[in-house]
Amino acid sequence: MKIWRFFLMKERTRLPFDNLPFYNKVMDKTAIKKLISRLIDHFGMTYTSHILDQLKTSGFQQATDTAISLGIDDLLTAPSKGWLVQDAEQQGSVSEKQNHYGNVHAVEKLRQSIEIWYATSEYLRKEMNPNFSMTDPLNPVHVMSFSGARGSTSQVHQLVGMRGLMSDPQGQIIDLPIRRNLREGLSLTEYIISCYGARKGVVDTAVRTADAGYLTRRLVEVVQHIVVRRTDCGTIQGIFVSPIRGRERDRNEIVVRTQILIGRVLADDVYINRRCIATRNQDIGVGLANQLINLRTQPIYIRTPFTCKSISRICQLCYGRSTTHSHLIELGEAVGIIAGQSIGEPGTQLTLRTFHTGGVFTGDIAEHIRAPFNGKIEFNENLVYPTRTRNGHPAYLCHNNLSITIDGQDQVQNLTIPPQSLLLVQNDQYVESEQLIAEVRARTSSFKEKVRKNIYSDLEGEMHWSTNVCHAPEYVQGNVHPILRTGYLWILSGGIYGSRVVPFPFHKYQDQVYVQPFVAKHQSLSDSYVDQVEHRSGDSNCYEKEEQIFSYSETETDRTISNKHRDSIYVFYPNNYNIKGKKQMNRFIVSLQCDKEWEKKIIPCPDAILRIPKSGILQRNSIFGYSNVEHGIPDGSNMTTPFSLDLSREGDNLQIQISYSISYEDGERIQVMSDISIPLVRTCIGFDWEQIDSIESEAYVSLISVRTNKIVNNMVQISLMKYPPFFMGRRDNKTSPNLMFHNNLDHTNLLSSNGASQLISKHQGIICSLSNGEEDSGSFMVLSPSDYFRIVLFNDSKCYDTGNQSNRKDPMRKIIEFSGLLGNLHSITNRFPSSHFLTYKKVLSKKHSIFHNSFNTFQVPKYYFMDENMIIYHFDPCRNIISNLLGPNWCSSSSESEFCEKTFPVVSLGQLIPESVWISEDEPLPESGQIIAVDEESLVIRSAKPYLATRKATVHSHYGKILDKGDTLITLIYERFKSSDIIQGLPKVEQLSEARLNNSISMNLKESFENWTGDMTRFLGSLWGLFISARITMEQSQIHLVNQIQKVYRSQGVRIGDKHIEVIVRQMTSKVLISEDGTANVFSPGELIVLSRAQRMDRALEEAIYYQTMLLGITRASLNTQSFISEASFQETARVLAKAALQGRIDWLKGLKENVILGGMIPAGTGQHIHRSGKRNGIDPRIGNRNLFSNKVKDILFHHDKVDFFSFQDNSYKYHNILKQQLK
């Protein structure tokens, strides 16, 4: 309706009143509705039509004279848009970082993004009206947008504000918003996203219009026979309606409650302080509705079509006033068809609108509480529980009313937080004015639907579960594990290789392998051969000599074969053994099958001759190659050659000590001297090395391999008393310069052309054991140098070391040189020379966490240090500062005060650390990872990626499983608010009308029945508790269904009378299903009959009829009516007619549709002459029904002669009859 500026002039010759005021105001659509209603009340329908004709003529004339046009210069953008978009982008960047750190998962990030940009778009839309009002009040865009005719504020907002969030073809909101408006122009990406919404609007306009028309047809079909036939059905039942719902300042809610009351009929007298202000069967007008709202706060009992006793009809008082005029509905009115058209018609019209956002955002359902002024907030921490908000922020949840106090400088204010609210601040926290401190849960839950979202791995590597991720025991053997508690899942970086990529059939744990990326042409000349040499003397197994020929890869330009010798300790004994000299040829052992025919093939490597069978099939454990290099041990020497020739001098004696450790199963918890359950890092046998005899030039050894019965999970923890320096060396080899080696002998064959051999470290990696112990299909994990990074703990060494360390060399060593990272390479005690390291006790430390609970409790060891002067120093885990327990300075031999302030982090082997955590004094951790080695001054960290998994999510892999990039990692299950616009709302109205199994009504029926059964059984006993609870549950479901349908329409400003929807819902719940428990042969089990018919037959028969109430959809209800002609004209004509002929059904032609089909007179129409008397049904309206309470009790308890839902014993029936006679 356009804006009309009109004048109602005083016309004494035409208007009957002389005191008509002069009215000069801009009239919008709502004001014109009120004007027409007042004109009808004062002048009647005929005179009002003449006034409206004059108003229409004046409007068209004024619109022609005005001639409003729209130009591009009229599109003015609000000046505040720039900083609003910039602020939203900054918030989105913070949300992206939190997701990268693992603090929030993908669903929470999407929610945050949607809320941020929706709030920005809405604020910009609200700024649009004041901007026009101040700069250009007569702007044509401004005038058109507020006219109510064409072009709403949301559409103008796309022209001068920002387009905002769009939806994809599936209706899901895209988290990338369109920041520009149509005046500024769209970028290519924004245009493509905008096309989604445009195409969706075109398709919806065509498809949804047809759906809305079909919905209207079904709605009319199910209620076409309902006509007002009686004045009063005599029922005393009804429903309670609250006049005010919510806070009184919410004017929109008051208007909604007023519209519900207007036109209804009271089912009981209304008293205020013992004074009757309204009587039963009195219709409620505007004056009485306002009086009830102003005077009452408790619910009002009104009549409704739900409880009308008329069979297949409806009475005048249960329906109430007509929606066309302010009088009771006339007899003969076809209210069923009116109800169907009233619900279906708005859907048909509103589908012509284009809603590109995919739904009205429902984030404003929760009510926010803000601080009134600056101050410190205080509350009882024992009454709140830590939780997470739906956006992933930490918060507190209060189950009961929580009293909080805000203490400002000049004032103190107490606030009460309602139950089930979220508190977003901590105790004793300083809050600023208007800061959000609590979020109150909405009283009525919005439409929600459960959605599954898959999270895919962004990293190739190995899966690890945090100790905070628990799994149900019944799913241990399955591949899908449900998560019982919120926690982290980690993907530890590592490459996956197998026989199909790089052929390594003889790989071992901690072996170094040569891995090249895929090339254009990749062929395999030979596999890797492991030279397993055993030098035996007596019964002792001394050491192992390994020789590996690395993988051969061929490209079109060059070929490379590298051969590598490596020495490693294989088996250890606590004592030393002398080894006698013995020579033995090295041999290659292969575990394959072959025949006995051989051929010689010379590999261009100077040390080996291979024998390969002609058929190419090798035999298991057969010797097919010999090495030309002999390895020998001199007679009588003590292990002089278990090391490489690169040693500066050979050691004479080596003493090996065995340290003890605890082995346990994965996930097992062990009690260690405390009541605290401590999860341990998986360890295996560790070795303490000690060089006894000093030599002129020191020689060091590195542990390369450890033999265990089974490859273990997690970490191998090893402590070395003396730290061996690793180094980079250069070998004089023209074909392979700059080869890095350590305790190894490297050979590169001469096939490399033009010096194209590459550094070993570039494609070399360490084979890592699988945590789950699986060794199937020959696949294994290789950790390349790119999977590691190193972080230096302290740059300034003078704070913790002596002066002789000033010339210490700390090169950035290649991780690949370590020949396998096996654990702690250095103890922390070496940081404090001549001091003793003591672990005193375990303590619990509270630290802010980002998953599940906002405060997570974990274990931190409490350390004490004792130096050579026997002075004990305490390490405070809360401050990370070492302090002297007895004196001001912990280092008594030095006077520098800086020693007291030196800090170091508490880290442990195998610890998983997220990104941005400060463990170094210089900078935070650059990326997430797992600590795999602890050095004297640095940490070696394996790259990892954390993923946050919430409760009820499912993990699609086992612990320790190797995953490729892009594999499905987690499936998150979350609740999403259903969009409430009319395009997305029409399917929801159809879903509710058809009573689908997945709607909220069906889900709440069972829970509501159980709740009411418990309450009623407690008050009335089991005899009537079950019966009344079943009846109340059905009534509550009817009301809930009406409210849900109304919510969809009201979200778009469409007002539909509740009585129209109640007529539809009444037909959906009017049928019952005969059960098989009864013994009466009147109805067949499984037959659908009308409830009133079942009640009548139940009263007439000796035996009870057992049935259960049903919630039928409108389609099914239309196919189960009393008229088979109406059913056959709707759907399934052949089946309906054949079934009716076989059953011998008779159609009594009581509805409108069947009479129209047969050409008869329809049983509807107004204008009947009825004699009205002062009494209605024999009851004086001035006195009322004095036996109203007695009739209510009868109607509740003895509406049936026998209780139909449940069978009771004979004494129960006897008690039932005695009580009935007393009431009579």
Curated annotation (Swiss-Prot):
Example GO CC term: the record gives: mitochondrion
Tell me the residue numbers annotated for binding Zn(2+).
Answer: C233, C308, C315, C318
Q: Where in the cell is it found?
A: Plastid, Chloroplast
The coenzyme or cofactor needed here is: Zn(2+)
Which biological processes are named by the entry's GO terms?
Answer: DNA-templated transcription
Task: Give the EC number(s) under which this enzyme is classified.
Answer: 2.7.7.6
GO terms of molecular function: DNA binding; DNA-directed RNA polymerase activity; zinc ion binding
Q: Which domain of life is it from?
A: Eukaryota
Keyword annotations: Chloroplast, DNA-directed RNA polymerase, Metal-binding, Nucleotidyltransferase, Plastid, Transcription, Transferase, Zinc
Catalytic reaction list: RNA(n) + a ribonucleoside 5'-triphosphate = RNA(n+1) + diphosphate
Q: Main location per UniProt?
A: plastid
InterPro entries the UniProt entry points to: DNA-dir_RpoC2_beta_pp (IPR012756), RNA_pol_beta''_euk (IPR050254), RNA_pol_Rpb1_3_sf (IPR042102), RNA_pol_Rpb1_4 (IPR007083), RNA_pol_Rpb1_5 (IPR007081), Rpb1_funnel_sf (IPR038120)
One Pfam entry name: RNA_pol_Rpb1_5
- Tell me the cofactor note: Binds 1 Zn(2+) ion per subunit.
Family, as annotated: Belongs to the RNA polymerase beta' chain family. RpoC2 subfamily.
HAMAP family in the record = RNApol_bact_RpoC2
User: PANTHER family under this entry?
Assistant: DNA-DIRECTED RNA POLYMERASE SUBUNIT BETA
Subunit-level organization? In plastids the minimal PEP RNA polymerase catalytic core is composed of four subunits: alpha, beta, beta', and beta''. When a (nuclear-encoded) sigma factor is associated with the core the holoenzyme is formed, which can initiate transcription.
What does the protein in this record do? DNA-dependent RNA polymerase catalyzes the transcription of DNA into RNA using the four ribonucleoside triphosphates as substrates.
What protein name is recorded for this chain?
DNA-directed RNA polymerase subunit beta''
